[in-house]
Amino acid sequence: MLLHIPTILSRTQATSMQERLAAANWTDGRETVGPQGAQVKHNLQLPETSPLRQELGHEILDALARSPLYFAATLPLRTLPPRFNRYQENHQYGFHVDGAVMSLPVAPDHTPASLRSDISCTLFLNDPDEYEGGELIIADTYGEHEIKLPAGDLIIYPSTSLHRVAPVTRGMRIASFFWVQSLVRQATHRHQLLELDTAIQSLTASNTDHNTILRLTNIYHNLLREWSET
């Protein structure tokens, strides 16, 4: 399921992040990928140990927690802390697939933890007219989809998808990216639950008979109970 979620960040929040990132120290993005990815990845990335990465990451996680649509679409169990990248002129990232299992930050009790990447997320931090090129291109069974969204908007898509970032030919593209392990492993099941949840919300807003809404809500939770992994 490819889904555009508008205004995760307000204009003020996105601008503030841009300003703080402008003064940051960036590193070669190839340092965070394996040999295959390094052959096609040409961008800059905020270091994992950067205090700014942690600060902005917390702000993004707080914003995501305030979005009912994000929660309904992802049903998050675990989230990798947001990372940040920058594409300048001639930067690009060729077709690649995200790793299936990723390490989470070490817990206070030093217990190792990992995340299964079910959903890939890109949060755009500057507007499309500030750069040329730089489209996120996602390939699926229906072809290739070009994504280039306003600052503060989020795109989510299955981590099983091949995807790339087109070459930037003018300006600079700044974004945050992260992965989610969902309570519901299968993308088709998540899509069905989102459609059902959306229908329930619409019927509730239109003052439909309470018993009808209750029956649909019962179906939703029983499906979630059957499909979820905790």
Swiss-Prot record:
Coiled coil: none annotated. Residues 78-182 form the Fe2OG dioxygenase domain. Binds 1 Fe(2+) ion per subunit. Keywords: Dioxygenase, Iron, Metal-binding, Oxidoreductase, Vitamin C. Pfam families: 2OG-FeII_Oxy_3, PKHD_C. 2-oxoglutarate binds at residue 173. It is an enzyme of class 1 (oxidoreductase). Disulfide bonds: none annotated. Its cofactor is Fe(2+); L-ascorbate. It comes from the Bacteria. The keyword rRNA-binding does not apply. InterPro entries: Oxoglu/Fe-dep_dioxygenase_dom, PKHD_C, PKHD_hydroxylase, Pro_4_hyd_alph, Pro_4_hyd_alph_FE2OG_OXY. Its EC number is 1.14.11.-. GO terms for biological process: DNA damage response; intracellular iron ion homeostasis. The keyword Transcription does not apply. GO terms for molecular function: 2-oxoglutarate-dependent dioxygenase activity; iron ion binding; L-ascorbic acid binding. Fe cation binds at residues 96, 98, 163. HAMAP family: Hydroxyl_YbiX. PANTHER family: PKHD-TYPE HYDROXYLASE YBIX. This is PKHD-type hydroxylase Xfasm12_1709. It comes from Xylella fastidiosa (strain M12).
